[in-house]
Regions:
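Amphipathic alpha-helical repeat scaffolds
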Residues: 155-162
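Helical hinge/lid and interdomain linker segments adjacent to catalytic or ligand-binding clefts
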Residues: 138, 152-153
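Structured alpha-helical segments in the cores of large, soluble enzyme domains
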Residues: 27-33, 141, 145, 157
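A short, conserved alpha-helix within the catalytic core of class I
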Residues: 162-168
C-alpha cells in the first residue's frame, strides 16, 4: 500500500516528502544555540506548508511561546493544484470548521495564522491556529502568497526539487 502511494506520487511528480518533527527540532536548535532570540518577536512565514501534513507548522505552533514568536503564517496548496491522482480527503480539522466548503476545499489554497490565545488557556499553540481559504490555489509563486513575505521577518520554504526558483 505505501509503495503504491509512492509510485503514484512519483507518477504525479509529487516530490513533497515531509520532514520529520525531530529533524526540524535539531535544525532549529542549531539556530537557537547561536542566538537564543533569533525568533523572538518575529513573524515566520511557511509558504506551501500544510500543517495537516507537514511538521514545520506543527513545530512552530508547539514552540510559539518558547520561541517568543509574534506571528506564524503558513499556506497550503489546493489539492487540485497538486495534480495528484489520489483523492484528497479534507481533515476533520477542516470539515468541522464553520467556513468549510467542499468545493473550495479542492480548488483553493488555505492560509493558517497563529498569533493569539483563542482557547483562553494562557498559551498560544496549535489549538489556537485559525484558517481560511485563499483566493487562489496557494501556489507560492502567486501574488497572494508573495505579498505575505512582506509581512514576514523569516521565511522557511521547502521548494519541491522540480520547481527551483527565486522566491521573489
Amino acid at each position: 500500500m505505501a509503495n503504491t502511494n509512492l509510485k503514484e506520487a512519483k507518477a504525479a511528480k509529487n516530490d513533497e516528502f515531509y520532514t520529520q518533527f525531530h529533524d526540524i527540532e535539531i535544525e532549529m536548535n542549531a539556530y537557537l544555540e547561536y542566538d537564543p532570540d533569533v525568533f523572538r518577536g518575529k513573524t515566520v512565514l511557511l509558504p506551501c506548508d500544510d500543517p495537516e501534513w507537514s511538521n514545520f507548522t506543527r513545530y512552530f505552533a508547539a514552540k510559539f511561546d518558547e520561541l517568543g514568536l509574534k506571528k506564524l503564517i503558513s499556506t497550503s496548496y489546493a489539492p487540485d493544484a497538486k495534480k495528484m491522482k489520489l483523492l484528497a480527503e479534507p481533515s476533520l480539522f477542516e470539515k468541522e470548521a464553520p467556513q468549510f466548503d467542499p468545493q473550495k476545499a479542492q480548488t483553493k489554497g488555505k492560509i493558517f495564522v497563529l498569533e493569539k490565545d483563542h482557547t483562553g488557556d494562557g498559551h498560544i499553540n496549535i489549538d489556537d491556529l485559525e484558517w481560511e481559504y485563499l483566493e487562489g490555489d496557494g501556489d507560492f509563486k502567486s501574488k497572494e502568497v508573495t505579498q505575505l513575505r512582506n509581512e514576514a521577518d523569516i521565511i522557511i520554504h521547502y521548494c519541491p526539487k522540480k520547481l527551483p526558483h527565486r522566491f521573489s
